[in-house]
């Protein structure tokens, strides 16, 4: 799977594989295994959120009045044009404030969502997440007699993810600190083991007896690291 997102500079890639089989080792013993693996990569933006503010691109574009510009404008050779940064050549986005950490140009501050311009941050800021997941389930069914049976099931689920977020040094809220880079790592290991013993029998063709005895053990280990 390799798809671009609805928003520019976003997308998702995934590779999955699965193997499943069972084997009748003996008349009284049947074993099986089910294994799955997934490798994925998500590309998005660290400033895209779901709250009602400028980090939400849909909210921002639907609610900002059209009189407010996306870019900083300049008057050049008798024409109004988009101003470009003299150092990088990038078009300069209007963040609705005169703060030095943003455009630093004199003028009026925007009353709607000052310091926000998700179109600008979406172009230069990035967020990557790479993940791996492994899941395996092994089973064993043992028939001691026609009425006494045992099932053993063990499951292992391992997940690993690496995250990277970058806020540009060229403009926006992280310009004043010369940009920001964040790294994260998350590891989760879950194990689950169950053993059940089932007794089923019928007496005098009238009375049915069904007894189930079981034991379950579950464990989760999580390790997380974040730095910027």
Task: Annotate each predicted stretch with a short phrase.
Residues 143:
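Functionally critical loop-and-helix segments that line ligand-binding/catalytic clefts
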């Amino acid at each position: 799977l390799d798809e671009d997102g609805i928003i520019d500079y976003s997308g998702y890639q995934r590779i999955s594989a699965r193997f499943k089989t069972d084997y009748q080792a003996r008349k009284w013993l049947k074993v099986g295994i089910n294994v799955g693996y997934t490798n994925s990569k998500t590309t998005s933006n660290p400033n895209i959120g779901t709250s009602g503010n400028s980090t939400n691109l849909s909210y921002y574009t639907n609610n900002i009045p059209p009189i407010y510009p996306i870019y900083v404008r300049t008057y050049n050779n008798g024409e109004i044009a988009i101003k470009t940064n003299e150092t990088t050549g990038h078009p300069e986005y209007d963040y609705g404030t005169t703060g030095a950490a943003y455009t630093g140009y004199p003028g009026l501050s925007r009353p709607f969502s000052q310091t926000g311009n998700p179109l600008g941050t979406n172009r230069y800021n990035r967020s990557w997440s790479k993940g791996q997941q492994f899941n395996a389930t092994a089973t064993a069914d043992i028939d001691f007699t026609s009425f006494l049976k045992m099932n053993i099931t063990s499951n292992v689920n391992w997940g690993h993810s690496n995250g990277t977020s970058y806020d540009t040094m060229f403009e926006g809220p992280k310009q004043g600190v010369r940009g920001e880079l964040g790294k994260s790592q998350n590891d989760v290991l879950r194990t689950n083991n169950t053993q059940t013993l089932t007794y089923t029998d019928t007496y005098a063709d009238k009375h049915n007896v069904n007894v189930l005895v079981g034991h379950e053990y579950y464990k989760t280990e999580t390790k997380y690291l974040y730095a910027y």
